């Protein structure tokens, strides 16, 4: 199975990236093919509301660094999305990425990606309470669930946790990847 990961943190060694990469380690150990996109290193434009996707039932036609992603998304069995938290919100580049999935709902309101893609959300925040802004993460993930993806798990990390709590979360992340 192909596992596509979209990492949203501008810090490759940051909490959300580290945790997401641990999920991917588990996926690789299970024999899955892994494709990684790092949004902070990509030229990704926001949706321009051109409606080409709706009128022609095609993936987004914008010529930016997301072009290869659409093919990978249609081929994958799992999608891992990770984001850091800025000011109690998913970081901006990941919201832009999320909005681009507008193209996956046709003009007839049918989802244009195969149903059942497994979805894993990985988030990092400064607040030690993982439930403090869970509603924000749920809002973000719901956009993917509205495209018939199935949420497998949601991981929330805080750098303020003791190391043993972080280690347990890293092990949980690995197991999630292993069991995709």
Regions found by a protein language model. Give the residues of each.
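N-terminal beta1-alpha1-beta2 submodule of the flavodoxin-like/Rossmannoid cofactor-binding fold
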Residues: 1-82, 88-104, 151-152, 160-180
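Short glycine-rich anion-binding loops that position phosphate/pyrophosphate groups of nucleotides
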Residues: 85-87, 126-127
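Short, glycine-/small-residue-rich phosphate/pyrophosphate-handling segment
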Residues: 92-93, 109-152
